[in-house]
Amino acid sequence: MTSSLAGQLFRMRNIDRVITSERSQKIRASFLFDGRQAADIDMQTIFDIGCDGLGELRKMNRKFDSFASTLFSPAIKDLDRVLQTREENERLDESIRSFLFLMAPYFLTKPAGKALEWLVRRFRIQEFNARDLLAAILPYHETKAFLTMLTIITFETRDMELFGFLVTQRKARRLLDRGTLMAQCVRDRALMTFVCSSVFRACQMGFEYAGLHAFYAMIFSQYITSLASVGGADVQFVLPFVLDGLQLDGDAQIAAYMVLGTLATRVTLSADALDKTLCAVAQRRADLRAMTMCVVQLVQTQEAALT
């Protein structure tokens, strides 16, 4: 009964989206073209553009191969997702999520733009997958490409409290500079949680890259330094993200060392928190030199907790 009711609610919720889907055939959202140009380009042409982009991405990374038989398959070319069941859309969302995080390192390249154009036109990722799309491209928030994508993203009402500030940026056609993003993260911990969770999800999915590690280290360290003071509640919020970062591999773990070092200069941890942190540092080490430097910094800054 519950499952049946959920299915009915899902179909009712999509009635407006079916209408919107029909209307969008006249008003085209586009990543590569302006609205007037996009309206004159048919679905087959956009599909060809997308497949061309995917082909170039496959040369850069063979992990893109699998999408030739899914998101970029001729068999799915005429699919309208608003007419699909909840289960079918969930499978589609999972595939789109994987593609977006895999695509992230190549976001500023022409092939990625071509592939995204197809996903925007056919699957309306700017509407149905807005959170995953933002999560994947947020490290590029200071670029024109990010702003271009932001101009076509549709935020659901439930997400406006979290992403409403982006609407202001979009209306003003302003790049999202680091200071603005950081100020919003300090005002709203939910946004900082979204940022950090997005980074960890990409790493756990195996889609990490150097720019992502740098983004995590920089934005989290700056978040800590931007706090007027670091109290117990702040430590309780920040430390779990640091400990999660220490469980990652390679450069992601080194980035976590940097964040931990910043935290250690701002606050004296409790004996229990310091013990958990040192255990986490010692448990997995991606780089012995980086780990040693981290431990030395902890000893120097946390002397009171060690005595």
Region locations from a protein language model:
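Extended alpha-solenoid scaffolds built from HEAT/ARM-like alpha-helical repeats
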Residues: M1-T307
